[in-house]
A protein has these predicted regions:
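A polyanion-binding, active-site-adjacent surface
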Residues: 2-182, 196-202, 210-245
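The conserved 3'-phosphoadenosine-5'-phosphosulfate
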Residues: 186
Length: 248
């Protein structure tokens, strides 16, 4: 089966996931107490699938869906303020076909970019429990295996940074002590398994590398306080483009 079809099948599994009773209950609660401006919406209120270009060289990892954003619309970052920032930047730097997205059926598409999250359900107060993060990890690990062309991982926020390092370590990457901060860049590598022919070991071991770029999350808490400005955010995407050009 092609990786793109495996990704699609994985997302179907994600949507059906009910591993976390607290999150299942919270999603139903949110759908019953909608803000007035969303009263006419039929909330998605299920785990959110990741989305994007299955041949992407750039993987963007967020924290979790927003209760009245992606959890409402059914697509990550769609219909919330964080998404306004992210999608606008993706459009400006050539990774998206339009500068905003308000609904999952609005023909918004990503090019050479794929978006996922640390957990797939909106958590109460935007704070997932450690067990909930672990329950979601297998989905992300499978995505890493299927997104075979990814060269740059963009980490939106501290939790995405910490949990992605943990996942990459489990995939055999050499992960030294690293610190989170806006606009930092790291290069990680791992040794790939090499075949043994007629009992003879190969003369060299092949290394696979991946670049990490960190940024403050484009949440309202950061953007409205000035902790993250648009020029700061756009500098991250300039870094991404530069890395892709160097590695082409």
């Amino acid at each position: 089966m092609k990786p793109s079809l495996k990704l699609k099948k994985l997302q179907e599994t994600v949507i059906q996931c009910r591993k976390c009773p607290r999150l299942v209950a919270y999603l139903q609660e949110v759908s019953q107490r909608k803000p007035r401006r969303y009263q006419d919406w039929d909330y998605w209120s299920n785990p959110l699938p990741s989305f994007g270009d299955p041949n992407a060289r750039v993987l963007i990892i967020g924290l979790a869906p927003a209760a009245n954003g992606g959890n409402r619309t059914g697509r990550m970052f769609t219909g919330d303020r964080s998404g306004e920032w992210l999608f606008n930047a993706l459009y400006q730097f050539g990774f998206a076909n339009q500068p905003n997205s308000l609904r999952r059926d609005d023909d918004f598409k990503l090019d050479n970019c794929y978006i996922t999250a640390t957990i797939r359900c909106a958590p109460p107060k935007n704070k997932p429990l450690p067990k909930e993060i672990e329950n979601c990890r297998p989905y992300f690990l499978e995505e890493l295996d299927l997104l075979k062309k990814v060269e740059v991982i963009v980490l939106l926020g501290q939790i995405a940074f910490t949990q992605t390092l943990k996942s990459l370590r489990s995939k055999g990457y050499d992960v030294p002590p690293l610190s989170f901060g806006h606009g930092k860049s790291y290069l990680l590598s791992r040794k790939l398994p090499t075949p043994v022919w007629n009992g003879l070991k190969p003369f060299h071991t092949e290394l696979q590398t991946i670049s990490l770029i960190t940024t403050y999350h484009p949440s309202q808490q950061n953007t409205q306080t000035g902790k993250l400005t648009r020029p700061m955010f756009h500098r991250v995407f300039k870094m991404i483009k530069k890395k892709l050009e160097v590695e082409s």
